[in-house]
């Protein structure tokens, strides 16, 4: 309780103070002789408490951000009130003294009690446009006082000038009524005069104005429209707004007003709508609908106006679906002062403060705010292009430049970000050709005018797949030290990638759970339900058909499917489905061209998982499921797929999944020891079945310890010739790093360097147009697997030549006799299936440097022969 109270107290201060909990708990454990079960329980509780602390810190940071936004709104309101008072003082100073004396005489005649003036500021500013400039309606005051004589009445205006303004108000009302009787006012001015008449009646204690034909009972201040910046009228010499947005509250008067607006707009289509020349904002009635953007109301438009009229280089215009555009950058050539011209420009263009192309599509190509989800269903065939055409042809060069810039940015963005956009449905319809042809042609015309529709190569990048939820897969005992396959594997790799800056250069793919249908492409339905949902979901299934008869009791106290593969019903299903789903998503984006290649930092591994058998830490065969999905979704782009498995253990599950598939090549470099190393499969004679004979190529090393020279010999004599002959369209690598140095003999025992894995990755980029995806399999020495993964990702990014740079010892050493014997057997068996393997025996017992020099000499001779010919 003391720790919890101290944590809460620190959260309310300047920042969260995280107590040093690990040292305290460990000291307590060390001082008492507790049972192992109690220690495990304390450790699990400690982990949960740390997670709660991190959640508390996250909530605290979000609360600080919300508080900052609230401070911004308060500052905006204070500046607004100050500007309002300054305008009132300026207006009073210009009043004719003659009007003051007339007002005194009038008030002497009507000195009785009056109703409270709740909308004094708004009424005064609304009716003070004698010189043709439309004043801005202000927010109604919240102060309401009891009925009192006029001389003692309190309001926002000083007492000294209240009589002058009252007389001025009466004069304005008389003028408006006279204009209305002559028929010079339009329908909107009639509505405005009705509202003003009602307020005038309350101010004069129930006295009705003469020549008043109709009144509107204003019983709530919510009828008052939003305040509009004065600079809009000054910039464009506009007379009066035709319609204003209502305050977005759930009050009854506002609801009635919205219903009235819908009734007024009934029967008039957007094509027949004629815009008025004397309007500031040509808002249509759908503009009154609530916005579905969370950012559209965060920053008030007038907050920019309150600052000095200078360009703000740091000012950003948030957009829900397009990259943020800096105000200084977007309007650099226009030299717009933020205080006035930007607001005026956006008003004439009929823009909301936040322009978003998917929002425009969802709004039926009318430029304005975002609409509700219900409007998106009627996107097709229910709107016209007149609104877009009229706004584009308004002579506003600034608006066209901004729109073209946003269209350009949208085209250059990856389709992956568009899919994640909450407004991307309308944009997806544009891509699928579902929008009316007229709308599509207008957008293309704007794009062609800016000259950016020329062929441009998309800027693809490397994708990374990772999710913290996969770390939570652990044994029920809670002691990760007793299990080599634990969450620290992917945590250490991810930290290494962050340390070298690779995560910042790449695009992180959103982790998704694989569906049951996707998993059933490789595994049976019962097996999928058992390990993807829960074993309890299979209680009604016949026990003979279950994939597992019973769980084993592990020495650590947990349970498992075998002596190595632990199972936890609370976390295993989620992690296993995320591992397969993340690889599917990453591979799909590479196949579609949204990413150039990728690395999936996932667990648990999968290449040992068979159709109905979990083993070797594996539950679902991630690589096999991803390949099946690619074959199903992209039969043209992924007609031929190559799987390279360089895990030190043979991928028995992957080989069984494709031993009959003539469109999938499976090649494995692994330790075999003549069948005495786990899992014991993957001999040189396993070449595939039926039409797929020769498409399973195993390089089963036995005997001596293998290092870089042996892997280089296998790569140049077997892997590269077969890959060149197969010509794959897509490559997936079972990237296990347990052949790397640092692993004990039982887990690997080989001494391959991390640079060798980078070298193999760089070599694979020469095939399949560089569409290569690596999926983490095995590897349990955290230091070596982190370095190996870093080398692979660096090679995928392709910005540095340091990736895969081998040492001189590796390049100038001969392979050991055990490797030479294995490679000779592989070539002898597979050269009947792959003619490119003929003559490769001579390249086995040479160094990598000698082989490169020999290739260079052969290439030079061929060039000389071509020149002579």
Swiss-Prot record:
Catalysed reaction equations from the record: N(6)-acetyl-L-lysyl-[histone] + H2O = L-lysyl-[histone] + acetate
SUPFAM superfamilies: Arginase/deacetylase (SSF52768)
Free-text description of this protein's post-translational modifications in UniProt: Phosphorylated by serine/threonine-protein kinase kin-29 at Ser-251; the phosphorylation inhibits repression of transcription by mef-2. May be phosphorylated by either cyclic-AMP dependent or cyclic-GMP dependent protein kinases.
Phosphoserine modifications at: 251
Any matching Pfam family: Hist_deacetyl
InterPro entries, sorted: HDAC_PDAC, His_deacetylse, His_deacetylse_dom, His_deacetylse_dom_sf, Ureohydrolase_dom_sf
Phenotypic consequence of residue 251 to A: Abolishes phosphorylation; causes significant down-regulation of chemoreceptor str-1 expression
Annotated effect of mutating residue 416 to A: Localizes to cytoplasm; does not affect chemoreceptor str-1 expression
Swiss-Prot/TrEMBL GO biological process terms: chromatin organization; epigenetic regulation of gene expression; negative regulation of transcription by RNA polymerase II; receptor guanylyl cyclase signaling pathway; regulation of neuron differentiation; signal transduction
Listed GO MF terms: calmodulin binding; histone deacetylase activity; histone deacetylase activity, hydrolytic mechanism; RNA polymerase II-specific DNA-binding transcription factor binding; transcription corepressor activity
Protein name per Swiss-Prot or TrEMBL: Histone deacetylase 4
Annotated organism of origin: Caenorhabditis elegans
Gene coding for it: hda-4
């Amino acid at each position: 309780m003391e720790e919890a109270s101290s944590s809460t107290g620190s959260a309310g201060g300047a920042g969260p103070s995280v107590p040093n909990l690990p040292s305290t708990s460990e000291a307590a454990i060390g001082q008492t002789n507790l049972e192992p079960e109690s220690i495990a329980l304390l450790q699990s509780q400690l982990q949960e408490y740390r997670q709660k602390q991190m959640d508390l810190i996250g909530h605290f940071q979000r609360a600080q951000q919300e508080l900052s936004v609230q401070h911004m709104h308060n500052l905006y309101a204070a500046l607004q009130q100050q500007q309002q008072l300054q305008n009132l003082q300026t207006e009073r100073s210009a009043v004719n003294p003659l009007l003051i004396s007339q007002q005194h005489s009038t008030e002497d005649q009507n000195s009785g009690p009056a109703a409270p003036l709740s909308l004094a500021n708004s009424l005064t500013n609304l009716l003070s446009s004698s010189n043709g400039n439309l004043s801005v309606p202000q927010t109604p005051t919240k102060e309401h006082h009891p009925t009192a004589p006029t001389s003692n009445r309190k309001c926002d205006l000083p007492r000294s000038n209240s009589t002058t303004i009252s007389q001025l108000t009466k004069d304005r009302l008389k003028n408006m009524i006279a204009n209305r009787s002559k028929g010079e006012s339009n329908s909107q001015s009639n509505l405005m005069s009705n509202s003003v008449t009602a307020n005038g009646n309350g101010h004069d204690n129930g006295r009705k104005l003469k020549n008043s034909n109709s009144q509107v009972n204003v019983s709530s201040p919510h009828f008052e429209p939003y305040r509009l910046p004065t600079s809009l009228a000054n910039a464009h010499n506009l007379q009066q707004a035709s319609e204003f947005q209502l305050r977005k509250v759930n009050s009854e008067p506002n609801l009635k007003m919205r219903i009235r607006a819908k009734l007024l707009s009934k029967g008039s289509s957007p094509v027949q709508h004629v815009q008025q020349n004397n309007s500031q904002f040509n808002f249509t009635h759908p503009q009154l609908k609530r916005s579905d953007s969370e950012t559209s109301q965060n920053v008030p438009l007038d907050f920019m106006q309150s600052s000095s009229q200078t360009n703000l280089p740091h000012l950003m215009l948030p957009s829900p679906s397009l990259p943020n555009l800096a105000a200084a950058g977007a309007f650099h050539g226009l030299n717009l002062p933020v205080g006035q011209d930007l607001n005026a420009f956006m008003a004439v263009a009929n823009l909301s403060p936040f322009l978003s192309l998917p929002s425009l599509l969802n709004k039926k190509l009318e430029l304005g705010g975002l609409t509700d989800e219900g409007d998106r269903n009627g996107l097709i065939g229910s709107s016209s292009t007149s609104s877009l055409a009229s706004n584009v042809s308004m002579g506003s060069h600034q608006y066209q430049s901004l729109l073209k810039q946003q269209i350009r940015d949208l085209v250059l963005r990856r389709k992956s970000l568009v899919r994640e956009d909450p407004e991307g449905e309308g944009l997806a319809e544009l891509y699928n050709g579902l929008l009316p042809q007229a709308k599509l042609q207008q957008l293309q015309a704007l794009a062609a005018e800016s000259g950016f529709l020329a062929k441009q190569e998309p800027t693809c990048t490397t994708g990374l797949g990772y999710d913290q939820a996969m770390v939570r897969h652990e044994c029920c005992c809670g002691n990760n030290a007793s299990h080599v396959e634990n969450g620290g594997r992917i945590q250490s790799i991810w930290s290494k990638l962050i340390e070298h800056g690779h995560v910042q250069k790449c695009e992180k793919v959103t982790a998704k759970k694989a569906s049951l249908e996707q998993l059933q492409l490789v595994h049976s339905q019962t097996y999928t339900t058992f390990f993807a949902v829960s074993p309890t979901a299979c209680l009604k299934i016949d026990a003979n058909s279950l994939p597992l008869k019973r769980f084993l009791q592990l020495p650590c106290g947990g349970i498992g499917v075998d002596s190595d593969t632990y199972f936890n019903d609370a976390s295993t299903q989620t992690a296993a489905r995320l591992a397969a789903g993340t690889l599917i998503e990453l591979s799909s984006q590479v196949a579609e061209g949204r990413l150039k290649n990728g690395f999936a930092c996932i667990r648990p591994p999968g290449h040992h998982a068979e159709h109905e058998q979990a083993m070797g830490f594996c539950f679902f065969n991630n690589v096999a499921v991803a390949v099946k999905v690619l074959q199903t979704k992209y039969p043209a782009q992924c007609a031929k797929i190559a799987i390279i498995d360089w895990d030190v253990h043979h991928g028995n599950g992957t080989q069984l999944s494709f031993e009959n598939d003539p469109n999938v090549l499976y090649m494995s470099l692994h330790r075999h020891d003549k069948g005495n190393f786990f899992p014991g499969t993957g001999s040189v004679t396993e070449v595939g079945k039926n039409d797929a004979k020769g498409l399973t190529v195993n390089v089963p090393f036995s005997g001596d310890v293998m290092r870089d020279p042996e892997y280089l010999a296998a790569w140049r004599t077997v892997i590269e010739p077969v890959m060149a002959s197969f010509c794959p369209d897509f490559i997936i690598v079972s990237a296990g790093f347990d052949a790397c140095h640092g692993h004990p003999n039982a887990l690997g025992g080989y001494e391959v360097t991390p640079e060798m894995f980078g070298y193999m990755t760089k070599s694979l980029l020469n095939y399949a147009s560089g569409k290569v995806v690596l999926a983490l399999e095995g590897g349990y020495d955290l230091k070596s697997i982190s370095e190996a993964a870093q080398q692979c990702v660096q090679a995928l990014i392709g910005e540095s030549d340091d990736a895969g740079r081998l040492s001189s010892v590796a390049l100038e050493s001969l392979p050991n006799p055990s490797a030479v014997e294995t490679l000779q057997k592989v070539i002898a068996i597979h050269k009947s299936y792959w003619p490119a393997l003929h003559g490769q025996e001579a390249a086995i017992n040479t160094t990598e440097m000698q082989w490169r020099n020999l290739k260079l000499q052969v290439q030079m001779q061929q060039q000389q022969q071509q020149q002579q010919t």
